[in-house]
Amino acid sequence: FPSAACGVVGLKPTWGRVSRYGVLALAESLDHIGPMVRCSADAGIMLQAIAGLDPDDPTSLPDPVPDMLEGIEQGVRGLRIGLDEKYISDNTDPELTASVLSGIRTLEGLGAEIVSIKMPDISGYMEAWGVLCSSEALAAHEETYPSRRDDYGPWFQAWLDNGALVTGAEYAKANNVRSACRGLLNNIFQDVDIICCPAMTSPPF
């Protein structure tokens, strides 16, 4: 989302692929570190540089870091792209939808295969995200909030205050919703290599 809002290329790596050591946390189980760059090749170069096991971050993955630029010149022939036209157009700026569809058709012309998919309704998942993120953010900022409340902006104050209202049962239910969402998306990825959709519903700011 930050990259889309700025009109640049962003890459959100697998959780744990990049160390979060030294980063001001928002939500422990949701935070990712990734490059914001000019183009896809730059994203690969940056990820190659920052990925890998970090002894200072026990959640960082021990898996070997592959060559992030391998195959970048091979084209997209045979790539299976999942597309839900209703999903990318509902409540989305028409110009943005048209731009996404144009990009997909370009990839199709280069040999990619477009596969019709049905994305799940994300409204319930976004509600669960709010429960998880706000409560984890409160935990991450417990040393400075609310003791230094005035150092926080009004929006983030409200976000943390909402997190303080979350019960253990509500957090557990939200985590179950997250697991269900992950399962649904994993099933979709059994048939496609990528899902093509806008990162947000409006053009860059």
Where are these regions (language model features)?
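Short glycine/threonine-rich loop-to-helix capping motif typified by GTGT followed
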Residues: 94-96, 125-135, 205
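Short connector loops at secondary-structure junctions
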Residues: 112-129, 160-161
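A short helix-breaking turn/cap at a secondary-structure junction
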Residues: 9-98, 103, 121
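Short, Asp-centered acidic motifs that coordinate Mg2+ and/or phosphate
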Residues: 34, 193-195
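Short helix-loop capping/hinge segments that flank enzyme active sites or metal/cofactor-binding pockets
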Residues: 70-85, 132-186, 198-203
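Short glycine-rich, flexible loops that bind phosphorylated cofactors or substrates
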Residues: 90, 203-204
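Acyltransferase
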Residues: 94-118, 141-147, 171-192
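FAD-binding core of FAD-dependent oxidoreductases
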Residues: 1-10
